[in-house]
C-alpha cells in the first residue's frame, strides 16, 4: 500500500481500454455495474491506436494505390499508371480520420455508459486492491470485481535494439517514408 493513502472503493475495474476492455466495461455497465477503466496510454488501447486498426488502414491505402496502378489494365485495357502516393497525407488520414474517429467514438461510448476512466498503470496490492501509478501520483482502488484486458508490448531481440533502422510495430506505423525493403520478425 501507499503510505498514508486510503483506497477509494469501486465496484468493477477493467484494466485496459482496448477492444476487450472497453467492450467488457460497457457490457458490465449495461448490466448495472459501476465501472472504472484503468488505462496506461490512450483510450482504445494498442489495437485502436498503434496496432490492428492503423495497420489495416495502411494496408487498405496500399491496396488502393496498387489498384490504381495495376488492376484496371488487365480488366478493360484502361491505362492508369500515373497514381502517386503522398505518404504524409496517408499518415494524416490514418491518424486523424481513422484512429481519432474510432478512439473518439469509444470515449463517447464510455461517457454515455457513465464509465469512469483513471489514467495510469495498475499494480495489484492484493486480490481486492490495485495501486494506480501515473507520472505524477499514485492512488489505491479497492474493487469487488476485476477484468484484466491488457494489450501487448513488443519485445526487443538481443542485439537488435529499437533504434535507427530497427523499429517495433509502433515505429513501423509512423515511418517518415515508405521503405524500399522491409523485414518483419514475428507478427
Question: Can you annotate each of these PLM segments?
Answer:
Residues 4-18, 180-185:
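Beta1/beta-strand and adjacent pyrophosphate-binding region of the FAD-binding site
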Amino acid at each position: 500500500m501507499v503510505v498514508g493513502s486510503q483506497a477509494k472503493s469501486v465496484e468493477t475495474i477493467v484494466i485496459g481500454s482496448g477492444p476487450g476492455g472497453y467492450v467488457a466495461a460497457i457490457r458490465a455497465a449495461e448490466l448495472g455495474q459501476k465501472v472504472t477503466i484503468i488505462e496506461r496510454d490512450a483510450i482504445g488501447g494498442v489495437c485502436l491506436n498503434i496496432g490492428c486498426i492503423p495497420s489495416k488502414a495502411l494496408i487498405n491505402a496500399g491496396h488502393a494505390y496498387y489498384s490504381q496502378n495495376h488492376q484496371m489494365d488487365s480488366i478493360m485495357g484502361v491505362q492508369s499508371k500515373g497514381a502517386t502516393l503522398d505518404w504524409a497525407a496517408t499518415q494524416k488520414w490514418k491518424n486523424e480520420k481513422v484512429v481519432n474517429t474510432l478512439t473518439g467514438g469509444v470515449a463517447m461510448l464510455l461517457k454515455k455508459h457513465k464509465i469512469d476512466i483513471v489514467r495510469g498503470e495498475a499494480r495489484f496490492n492484493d486480490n481486492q486492491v490495485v495501486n494506480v501509478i501515473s507520472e505524477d501520483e499514485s492512488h489505491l482502488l479497492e474493487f469487488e470485481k476485476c477484468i484484466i484486458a491488457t494489450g501487448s508490448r513488443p519485445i526487443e531481440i538481443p542485439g537488435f535494439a529499437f533504434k535507427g533502422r530497427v523499429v517495433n510495430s509502433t515505429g513501423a506505423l509512423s515511418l517518415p517514408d515508405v521503405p524500399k525493403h522491409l523485414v518483419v520478425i514475428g507478427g
